[in-house]
Amino acid sequence: MRITITHTAMLTVLTFALASCVRADSKTGARGESTTGAPAQSAAAAKAADAPKETWRSLLETKTAKGWRGWASPDLPKGWKVTEGVISKDGEVDDLVTREEFANFELKFEWKLGKGGNSGLFYRGTREYDHIYWSAPEYQLLDDANAPDSRSRLTAAAADYGLYPAPADVVLPFDQWNKTRIVVDGAHVEHWLNGKKVVEYELWSPDWTAKVKASKFVKYPNYGLAKKGYIGIQGDHPGTLALRYMQIHELP
């Protein structure tokens, strides 16, 4: 009876050892590398962690606007000022343009206007015409409640000026900060306002071409055709304008 127990115990130990070897072998490859799912997930997580993250850089320094110049001036034009990262103007002044050109990007910033204020943010502008707005699409900045341009949604806040309308009741009242995001990726463009996508269109498409031909831009044959250009801020309207937290993320 004691011998039977001993053999049974030995068989149990051997069975357990063999099972352990089989389990260990299933987890280990020829080079001792794990072949189970969990380590593969860890590798994927590590790869994701090593992947390049979106890099945003500021276009407005805290106390200077060294990345900007006037449309007609090599320096910051009279009437514009920079204070603690906010660039502002009061009255009619020269337009601002970046010193650097941009092709594909996401741009985000906050802006506010005084009562009845009117301005715009231009993208992919060139210098072939007398003004940037004859070459560059424009994200309209407007006090919809009081500015005459709001009579048409084609020229209201966040519209692609003169071509694609933006809906009403998204922009905040004057003297309040609005949040804007603009995506320009190849031919694809998106206008966002206060967390809502309000305009989306394709540059150079048949629809876009037809709209340009029906607009005042038809007199400027290269309007909107540039694939790379300057970002501009319109200054030639009266009233106050302020922008802050302007950052850009360049796309491939």
Predicted feature residues:
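Carbohydrate-interacting regions of secretory-pathway proteins
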Residues: C21-P252
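Bacterial N-terminal signal peptides
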Residues: T8-A19
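Positively charged n-region of N-terminal signal peptides that target proteins for export
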Residues: M1-H7
